[in-house]
């Protein structure tokens, strides 16, 4: 049996290199002459000469079908060889003509993925930093004329009073400073000289306070301060000034009564009035300090000075008022002293009761008015120490009225029974009352200084105002703290809707121009430039959205003075 002809194809090879004929004969015995005859009949060389071709291809060989040979053996007789379907000369020549036809070559299309090269910025990168003109002049020892030659960039202003301001690239300023001064060492020497000159200049200014104030006003480091005198004609300042005047007079007359009578209860009341007068003077100092305008060292202002002065006042009441009253009462119990006529003491206590009661009414009316304005109850307003100065006056005058009642009662018992121990017990009672007041003041003012949240209803209102904006998805980590003087600081993490922010940017763009820019993009570098341009503008739009929300919060809630919205 003759197996099939195995064919393989390759470009630009002859017919003889593509066709290979293997003949196998299964005859048990075959004469060499017969075998040679058969091989001469069907030879690869003669067949290849029959089909001359210089450009064969794989698909054409399927048309050539050869062969099969039947070898019959009868004993030792001769063999017959038969070749089936051997191609004729015309067929082979047709195949050769086909193979000579030029091949149709199609262009190869290879998809290559464009990858943007990653930039390595390192641990420190300042090439894109902006600085203001003032910083450029001060830090790099330049002049205004030097900055005129640099590229100017307009950016959004972080201050409420201006919309935008001019900045410069830090790299441009550094290059300009090196051009002016020649080397970093020369620049460092110049900065050192200017620093020394500035220190010397300030030392000269400190010798004259008037020149120093004019210098600060000229530089604009601080805004004009509020007149402290006007603070004491309204609100808590008015209450404090009334209390200082009345308690000062009461202290003077109580000391006269104590000197005249020698009563321990009267001594406690005199000490009580003295401590009240000193503490209220401290409150007045805190009020005058709290209205100062914020400066670079205290960016959130001095409103906490009211709480600080109230805290010190509470400590002073405990040490001076309660301590001396307990000491004098204990000494009266251990060493009783005879008491003179108490008539003048009763008169002074009566006058003190009237005056302290009047001051108490002034403080109560002020607190009620403020509590009503805040939408809070009187009790809650007092317990949370929303107005620390008036709170101190309220508690001190309440303690003063109760102290007068305690002292008058104990002195009356002493007058009736003639036992001075009742008078000493009255001194201990007044001291205990002052200790309770001081403990309450220390606790409430400490809580206020630690940072206290505003009312939950107010926090909810501020949060809903932000959540109702289309550009906001969600609000997280809300913190709203009371800074004192009716000022609130609001902080929140804001999850912005990127689609809304992007649409806000696109609404201000010329779509025809953008479409033309897109059509001009042909290379990855051009695509990068296009994306960076609009990406930076979208980031600026996001910053503008943050500024808009902050202004909206302050406009609808005047008590909110500081807003920090962080992008989540």
From Swiss-Prot:
> What reaction(s) does this enzyme catalyze?
Zn(2+)(in) + 2 H(+)(out) = Zn(2+)(out) + 2 H(+)(in)
Q: In which tissues is it expressed?
A: Ubiquitously expressed in fetal and adult tissues and cancer cell lines.
What InterPro entries does this protein's entry cite? Cation_efflux (IPR002524), Cation_efflux_TMD_sf (IPR027469), DNA-bd_dom_put_sf (IPR009061), SLC30A9 (IPR040177), XPA_sf (IPR037129)
Identify its membrane topology class: Multi-pass membrane protein
SUPFAM superfamilies the record matches: Cation efflux protein transmembrane domain-like, Putative DNA-binding domain
User: Could you tell me one molecular function GO term of this UniProt entry?
Assistant: transcription coactivator activity
Key word Transport present in the record? yes
Transmembrane residues, as ranges?
A: 239-259, 314-334, 342-362, 392-412, 424-444
Q: Where in the cell is it found?
A: Mitochondrion membrane; Nucleus; Endoplasmic reticulum
The Gene Ontology CC terms held by the record are: cytoplasmic vesicle; cytoskeleton; endoplasmic reticulum; mitochondrial membrane; mitochondrion; nucleus
- UniProt keyword terms in alphabetical order: Antiport, Disease variant, Endoplasmic reticulum, Ion transport, Membrane, Mitochondrion, Nucleus, Transcription, Transcription regulation, Transit peptide, Transmembrane, Transmembrane helix, Transport, Zinc, Zinc transport
An individual GO BP term: intracellular zinc ion homeostasis
Motif LXXLL motif covers: 462-466
Where along the chain is the transit peptide annotated? 1-67
Similarity section:
Belongs to the cation diffusion facilitator (CDF) transporter (TC 2.A.4) family. SLC30A subfamily.
Name the PANTHER family for this protein. HUEL-CATION TRANSPORTER, PROTON-COUPLED ZINC ANTIPORTER SLC30A9, MITOCHONDRIAL
Subunit and partners: Interacts with GRIP1, ESR1 and AR.
* Disease / disorder: Birk-Landau-Perez syndrome: An autosomal recessive syndrome characterized by early-childhood onset of different combinations of intellectual disability, muscle weakness, camptocormia, oculomotor apraxia, and nephropathy.
Q: What does this protein do?
A: Mitochondrial proton-coupled zinc ion antiporter mediating the export of zinc from the mitochondria and involved in zinc homeostasis, zinc mobilization as well as mitochondrial morphology and health. In nucleus, functions as a secondary coactivator for nuclear receptors by cooperating with p160 coactivators subtypes. Plays a role in transcriptional activation of Wnt-responsive genes.
What's the name of the protein? Proton-coupled zinc antiporter SLC30A9, mitochondrial
Q: Per the UniProt entry, what species is this protein from, by scientific name?
A: Homo sapiens
Give the organism's phylogenetic lineage.
Eukaryota, Metazoa, Chordata, Craniata, Vertebrata
